[in-house]
């Protein structure tokens, strides 16, 4: 695992190994890894297959914009179904001990996917080919063509059991809502708080700092980036700024309503039974109310 890592880099705890499985094989990662970073650290680059032609795909980003590394995740055996969640981005899902994951859109397995024959026969599969191809005999549509086409559609498979987790929602009232806790977002939050405003700062990542977290060589005000972030976090807390990590802004609606979704337990090895898995919060922004609630992308306001 360590031979693929750059020692001294990354926001991971080398003293805290974490075990997880991917497609039935057990791997070791570190506390602070995502599934994608842990797989890469183990030399695993193939994480999925493309939708139509089943071409091999690996991670190409480090966040919620990831288009390729979509996996199924579960707290228990995948077959149990209840806590199975498809189409989770491997670049976002934090590693937790005992996490069970699987690749998607392949058969019988990821390395040898029979669906890849579509790539060889790509000339037969032009855009919208199914609207013109499966016309005859008419009696085949319901019993042959449609079941095959529906079976090939989509990437992940749906859960088979009711979701055992529970979720919470609430309204949050704030004067200023800042989405994205990079250097600009942190500075804006501090300035607003010093003016006497009630401030909420949200970010989709487990830690605030944005791109500064991946570039510790940067200096701000004569301090290394990581030291500057820690100092600003102390100042923000002292100023009473509401800090929400793992929080995604999902929409900006009428009357300054912003919807947020906050992941509360997805990263915990054993979440408390009474704790909701996620919180969704909404309310107008700028008039004293704001929405807050699960993952979070950086876009400074």
Where would I find each of the regions flagged by the language model?
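Signature of N-terminal electron-transfer/Fe-S-associated modules in redox systems
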Residues: 1-155, 163, 291
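Short coil/turn connectors at secondary-structure junctions
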Residues: 14-17, 30, 65-68, 172-173, ...
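FAD-binding core/adjacent interface of flavoenzyme oxidoreductases
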Residues: 55-60, 97, 103-179, 226-301
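Beta1-alpha1 glycine-rich phosphate/pyrophosphate-binding loop at the start
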Residues: 174-235, 239, 248
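Short, hinge-like loop/turn segments at secondary-structure boundaries
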Residues: 66, 217-221, 262
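Short, glycine-/Ser/Thr-/acidic-enriched flexible segments
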Residues: 34-35, 76, 184, 206-207, ...
């Amino acid at each position: 695992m360590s031979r693929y890592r750059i020692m001294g880099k990354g926001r991971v705890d080398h003293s805290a190994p974490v075990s997880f499985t991917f497609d039935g094989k057990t791997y070791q990662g570190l506390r602070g890894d995502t599934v994608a970073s842990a797989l890469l650290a183990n030399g695993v680059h193939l994480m999925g297959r493309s939708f139509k032609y089943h071409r091999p795909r690996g991670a190409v980003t480090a966040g919620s914009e990831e288009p390729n590394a979509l996996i199924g995740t579960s707290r228990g055996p995948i077959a149990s179904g209840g806590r199975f969640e498809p189409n989770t981005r491997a670049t976002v899902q934090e590693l937790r001990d005992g996490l069970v994951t699987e690749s998607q859109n392949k058969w019988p397995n990821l390395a040898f996917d029979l669906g890849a024959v579509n790539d060889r026969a790509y000339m037969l599969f032009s855009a919208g080919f199914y609207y013109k191809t499966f016309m005859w005999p008419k009696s085949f549509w319901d019993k042959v063509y449609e079941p095959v086409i529906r079976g090939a559609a989509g990437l992940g498979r749906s859960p088979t059991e009711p979701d055992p987790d529970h979720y919470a929602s609430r309204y949050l009232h704030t004067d200023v809502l800042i989405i994205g806790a990079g250097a600009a977002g942190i500075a804006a939050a501090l300035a607003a708080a010093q003016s006497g405003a009630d401030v909420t700062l949200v970010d989709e990542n487990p830690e605030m700092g944005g791109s500064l977290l991946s570039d510790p060589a940067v200096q701000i005000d004569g301090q290394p980036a990581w030291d500057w972030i820690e100092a600003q976090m102390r100042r923000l807390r002292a100023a009473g700024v509401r800090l929400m990590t793992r929080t995604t802004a999902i929409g900006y609606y009428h009357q300054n309503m912003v919807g947020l979704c906050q992941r509360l337990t997805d990263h915990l090895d054993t979440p408390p039974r009474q704790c909701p898995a996620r919180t969704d919060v909404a309310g107008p922004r700028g008039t004293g109310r704001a929405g807050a609630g699960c993952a979070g992308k950086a876009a400074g306001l």
